UniProtKB/Swiss-Prot annotation:
The keyword Magnesium does not apply. HAMAP family: Ribosomal_bL27. This is Large ribosomal subunit protein bL27. SUPFAM superfamilies: Ribosomal L27 protein-like (SSF110324). Gene3D superfamilies: 2.40.50.100. Keywords: Ribonucleoprotein, Ribosomal protein. One of its GO terms (biological process) is translation.
Length: 86
């Protein structure tokens, strides 16, 4: 009874689906109200003027205008604002 021992099966071969995070609209770009500006985990970017923050920390435009990124304040926070189009 010539046997061949069963080969071991690999326990690898899994990976999570990418979440497509990151900046979606860049500085100087024109956006409409409701457009998503940044998808993030936690507040890497903070909401500034005319920008809202969703419950998953997604930043979105509250009105039409141009995107502006700033760094400043006492904690050197990165903020995203919307400058109204004149």
């Amino acid at each position: 009874m010539a046997h061949k021992k069963a080969a071991g099966s690999s326990r690898n071969g899994r990976d999570s689906e990418s979440k497509r995070l990151g900046v979606k609209r860049f500085g100087g770009q024109f956006v409409k109200a409701g457009n998503i500006l940044v998808r993030q985990r936690g507040t890497e970017f903070h909401p500034g003027e005319n920008v809202g923050c969703g419950r998953d920390h997604t930043l979105f435009a509250k009105q039409d205008g141009f995107v502006k990124f700033n760094v400043g304040g006492p904690l050197n926070r990165r903020t995203v604002s919307i400058v109204a189009a004149e």
